[in-house]
């Protein structure tokens, strides 16, 4: 939630019924494009799978905003060859389900600074006194658990109960009591990825790991792996 839960305030005096309302529906950033088109009297193209917010503006019930979908690929050049950490997630009122497509990669970047463009360990986390402290005392009682959450590997699936664990500290995925919830959210997420033709699901070319990197490079010889010829 720290990366994706952002308040949204909208003002449109002539287009919002009963202004001043607080809406708890989930909004994806991509929903803004069809909203602007609809507001301008235009029909969103069929390629747009996001949903307009106009029904919410008009104080009508909407079935299209009951969950938020989140995605991540490469954030920083902190793995060998410029590889990212691909994951997709679905956030509902009660749960957060995350699917990590490459669980053998370091989510916060490699601990080996020589494979990081900026020559720092765990490059997804910027240098700071807090990071330095956690790295230096990561084996100390009271710090080890936090350090593992910050720097450690993650399983292929994560599931958090936001009512009992709002800070998402305890991964429930794989436990019997939440098996049905996990399966339901997994299906909803993967159905959405199929609808949006996400290549991580459809089997098409996945080029995100091979995109050029435009950040600072301090490590001599560091570069992004070239795109495989089969994907040209």
Regions from the language model: what does each represent?
Residues 1-47, 51-66, 88, 152, ...:
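Substrate-binding rim/cap in mid-to-C-terminal beta-strand-loop elements of soluble/periplasmic
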Residues 23-27, 111-118, 174-177:
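Short intrinsically disordered coil segments
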């Amino acid at each position: 939630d720290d990366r994706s839960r952002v308040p949204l305030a909208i003002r449109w005096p002539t287009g919002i019924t009963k202004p001043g309302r607080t809406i708890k529906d989930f909004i994806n950033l991509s929903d803004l494009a069809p909203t602007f088109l609809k507001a301008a009297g235009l029909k969103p193209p069929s390629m747009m799978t996001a949903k307009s917010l106009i029904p919410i503006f008009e104080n009508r019930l909407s079935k299209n905003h009951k969950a938020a979908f989140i995605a991540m690929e490469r954030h920083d050049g902190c793995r060998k060859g410029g590889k990212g950490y691909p994951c997709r997630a679905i956030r509902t009122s009660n749960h957060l389900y995350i699917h990590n497509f490459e669980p053998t990669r370091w989510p916060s970047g490699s601990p080996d600074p020589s494979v990081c463009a900026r020559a720092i360990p765990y490059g997804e986390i910027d240098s700071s006194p807090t990071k330095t402290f956690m790295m230096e005392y990561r084996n100390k009682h009271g710090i080890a658990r936090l350090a593992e959450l910050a720097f450690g590997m993650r399983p292929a699936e994560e599931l958090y109960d936001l009512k009992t664990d709002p800070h998402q500290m305890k991964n429930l995925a794989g436990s019997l009591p939440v098996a049905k919830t996990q399966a339901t959210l997994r299906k909803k997420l993967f159905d959405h990825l199929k609808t949006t033709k996400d290549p991580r699901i459809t089997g098409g070319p996945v080029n995100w790991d091979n995109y050029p990197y435009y950040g600072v490079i301090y490590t001599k010889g560091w570069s992004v792996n070239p795109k495989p010829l089969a994907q040209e």
